[in-house]
Design a protein with these regions (language model features):
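All-alpha prenyltransferase/terpene-synthase fold signal
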Residues: 1-130
Length: 130
């Protein structure tokens, strides 16, 4: 799950760069972890179900290489169900994070989008078709 760990780290680093509190960093770790997990499950599903033309890379490589994936561990239906659970948990975590974000108190700070960019990334990661 190297890609998932990288995604989690990137989300947390964004918070660190913005001077996030420990509470916010914990929330960002959770969001990043779920985002990374969702991305990985979706990647495994796409590798098993999509064709190479749609993916833009060779489909079925994980199975051909004997890799352990969410699809090999849970089956297609199980991996889809797990992705649905992760996506719902991610949505809830993003909503809670956005609700806790006040608007910036001064004009020197960029406008606060209450995590909209992160939410958009989450949707792309777990609902993508390639």
């Amino acid at each position: 799950m190297k890609t998932g760990a990288l995604i989690e780290a990137a989300v947390v680093m964004g918070g660190l760069l913005r001077g996030a509190s420990e509470v916010d960093l914990a929330a960002l770790r959770r969001i990043g972890g779920l985002l990374g997990l969702g991305f990985q499950i979706k990647d495994d599903l796409l590798d098993a179900e999509a064709d190479s033309a749609t993916l833009g890379k060779t489909a079925g490589k994980d199975e051909a290489q004997g890799k352990s994936t969410y699809v090999t561990l849970l089956g297609l239906d199980g991996a889809r169900a797990r992705l649905d659970v992760v996506a719902a948990e991610l949505d809830a975590a993003l909503l809670a994070f956005a609700a806790a974000r006040p608007a910036p108190a001064n004009d020197a700070m960029p406008a606060n989008d209450n995590g909209q960019a992160l939410a958009d990334l989450a949707v792309m990661a777990v609902r993508r078709s390639r």
